[in-house]
């Protein structure tokens, strides 16, 4: 499983998602992630909206194996369900 987290500095939900991904990387086989700082990379919410397929108002926006799954709480719920790991 490969997770991409699109976030920005100063976003507490981005930090939570990144911390959970880091924990999973250490505990779950075949799990890896990449954190993308949308400010540093020059990615706009309009750019993210194109990838997600609907208008994006918040970050983080998280993709699992290239499929958009939503934000931090969606990610936490999926990881708890699939791996029984909580943040």
Short names for language-model regions:
Residues 16-17, 44, 74:
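Residues at alpha-helix caps and immediate loop-helix transition turns in enzyme cores, especially N-
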Residues 19-21, 50, 76-79:
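Short, glycine/charged-enriched secondary-structure capping and boundary segments
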Residues 36-56, 83:
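Thioredoxin-like thiol-disulfide oxidoreductase module
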Residues 52-63, 72-73:
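Structural micro-motif
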Residues 64-87:
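Non-catalytic, surface beta->alpha helical segment in thiol-disulfide oxidoreductase systems
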